[in-house]
Amino acid sequence: MDPRARAVYRVDVRSFFDTDADGLGDINGVAAKIDYIKELGADTLMLSPVFSGEGFMIDTEAGTADDLDALIDKAASRMIGTVLEMRADMPLNDASDIDRASAAMRYWLDRGAMGIAVNTDALTASGDKRALHRAMCALNRNVFSLYPDCFTVGIGKNVPFEDAVQLTRTENRELLMQLYTPAHMAEAFSPASGSLGALFGGGDAKRFKHDADYYQVQGELKGGWFLNGISLTQGQFSSQQELTRRLRSKAACLYVMTGRGTPLIRQGDEIGLYAENTPMQWNNSRAAGFTLGTPRLKGDGSLSHINVEDDMTHMDSAFSFYKRSIALRRSHSALIGGEYAPVDSENPRVMAYTRSDGAESLLVVINITDRAAKVALTGYKKGECLLFTNSPKPIAESMKLQPYEGFVYRLR
């Protein structure tokens, strides 16, 4: 499968599901919930690091090598490929480091893993950009190129844009894609000091829109490819704010699924659970169904109104919208490899852009603020509404959007 067409679901193993009642999630917990990931529509499972030492051994709190083998096999039987994230502190400073890392990566690829995720921040922090590219070229030569369908991604928040592009240019033979979400963009969908009114007030929304358009357009022009995700962290919502949570989740999903890049869903994004590294909330029972023991990780206290079981039963839920969005992306080639072109580019509140290839042209419109907003769609008069966050609405050259409202139109 074309790696651009995949939908990646990233699991933090420690906080996903606990099967041995020790209060921490484990590899067997991911295997137990693999059908949930399949139901969502993701076809790629990215695991947080589960290794100890140099990458051959499994951390005993996470499980065993046999457990990981069983998970890889079970995922494959559901047509889900498994990508293993290497430890962030894996040294890649010299030839001997790279040889040891290469051996560990080949070991797991030979055992059935589909791909490898490498932390690129440590090498970036050294200040020697050449070291980063030398290391990735060496890993490509020693490992990635030996496995024709190997899915490779760089993980890191500190890689400069130009380096992220260079890492993923095909002719450079380094990585397939780089997770690239600058810190200010990652935080853009997060409330400031718990105030929903500050979510996208003033400059934050404008900056997010400007930078998102820039990275999309320039990434395409320069031949880069990104793993496209928004970290919805630190959001605290009461049951009275349920509608806001749901709409905000849908707006973020719509951007991730229709932008240029391979979409990344971090566990919990699909139900609007934004607290990073807290237990996944499966139901509203004790410990949110995460464990029969005592959780060692702190929950976010919203299990009564944010949990998987509840979201899966409602057609208007964030989970249902994620399912529809993943399916839509998979069925429209323009959303996978099409050109990205901004529309109404000076609008500070609305993301609007087209995705076009030789087969079709789609228009995406998203209000990224908590206030009503207008968007000018001059020249766009006819289109079929394929996806909507609230309710369907015909396309018009001037549209008023409700908070976090969004649409995808197939243009005629």
Indicate residue ranges for each PLM-predicted region:
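Acidic/aromatic-lined carbohydrate-recognition and catalytic surfaces
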Residues: 1-159
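Loop/helix patches that line or flank the sugar-binding groove of alpha-linked glycan CAZymes
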Residues: 3-5, 203, 211-214, 220-229, ...
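Short catalytic/ligand-binding loop motif for oxyanion handling, primarily in non-cytosolic enzymes
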Residues: 17-19, 53-54, 90-92, 124-127, ...
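Active-site-proximal helices and loops of the catalytic beta/alpha 8
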Residues: 69-81, 117-218, 271-286, 356
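Surface-exposed loop/turn positions
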Residues: 150, 384, 403-405
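Beta-strand-rich binding/interaction modules
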Residues: 372-390
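C-terminal beta-strand-rich structural cap/linker in extracellular carbohydrate-active enzymes
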Residues: 395-412
